[in-house]
């Protein structure tokens, strides 16, 4: 706007008749009356007419416009919200949550495989005809009953396993202990990392997981039965690079139940054949 006025004012002044009074209406809303007069002494004959210069009032108006620039632009309306940004990096693992509620009973499973053969008892020898009216016999020793019970227990099914972890694991996954040392009964599967019960009874399980640290993180390891956590252990990387997470349980298992160790965040050290991380269990006594 100021630039247009600076150009328009001189043009208006040039268009006015020389020596005549004129009026100017400027942007400052004031009227200026300033006649243009010829130079003293007139012009010599034959001299080329010179355009009149701007008046003093016009110069004052132009200086006033230069000193007071037009107001700034009016702020427009608020724009629409921008597009959502990209997802941020994945945060560290959170603390283990509490166990969930017990689920409803599952459907009845298929019939199990035939059980192991029972104990073979030897036939007793026939006794002679007793004497009528004989006296009472001497009481037997209770040690024989205890020995018989222990014999029946230890002569039952033999189920035990002891396995180690060769390759490292991290994140949230079932630990597949692939270094099998003992697997009586072949109830442990190294391809899945799970122990599958085939004989109902009371079992003992224990696990020891070495954390692969050095970056200030922690590791959680849970022993699960059919997806439900039955024991948990944590290892923290405080002042050292390695720490152990260990725990043990005694569980009653039915045929078809599965027991395994699940990593719930962190890094587990494998150790090739050194067996730094192990998982073992055995049958205490069958039902």
Curated annotation (Swiss-Prot):
SUPFAM superfamilies with a match to the protein in the record: TNF-like
The listed locations are: Secreted
CC terms in the record's Gene Ontology section: cerebellar climbing fiber to Purkinje cell synapse; collagen trimer; hippocampal mossy fiber to CA3 synapse; synaptic cleft
Source organism, top-level taxon: Eukaryota
Q: What does the record give as the function of this protein?
A: May regulate the number of excitatory synapses that are formed on hippocampus neurons. Has no effect on inhibitory synapses.
Say if the entry is tagged with keyword Ribosomal protein: no
Organism for this UniProt entry: Homo sapiens (Human)
| One annotated GO molecular function | identical protein binding
> What InterPro entries does the record tag this protein with?
C1q_dom, Cerebellin_Synaptic_Org, Collagen, Tumour_necrosis_fac-like_dom
> Secretion signal: which residues?
1-21
Annotated region Disordered: the residues are 42-127
As recorded in UniProt, coiled-coil segments are: none
One GO BP annotation is: neurotransmitter receptor localization to postsynaptic specialization membrane
Q: Which UniProt keywords apply?
A: Collagen, Secreted, Signal
Q: What is its main location?
A: secreted
Tell me the subunit arrangement.
Forms homotrimers which can further assemble to form higher-order oligomeric complexes. Interacts with ADGRB3. May interact with ERFE. Forms heterooligomers with C1QL3 and C1QL4, when proteins are coexpressed; this interaction does not occur after secretion.
Composition bias (Pro residues) maps to: 84-104
Annotated Gene3D superfamilies: 2.60.120.40
Q: Where is the Collagen-like domain?
A: 76-118
> Has UniProt tagged this entry with the keyword rRNA-binding?
no
Q: Which SMART domains does this entry report, sorted A to Z?
A: C1Q (SM00110)
Q: Which PANTHER family match?
A: CEREBELLIN-RELATED (PTHR22923), COMPLEMENT C1Q-LIKE PROTEIN 2 (PTHR22923:SF69)
Q: Where is the C1q domain?
A: 154-287
Protein name per UniProt: Complement C1q-like protein 2
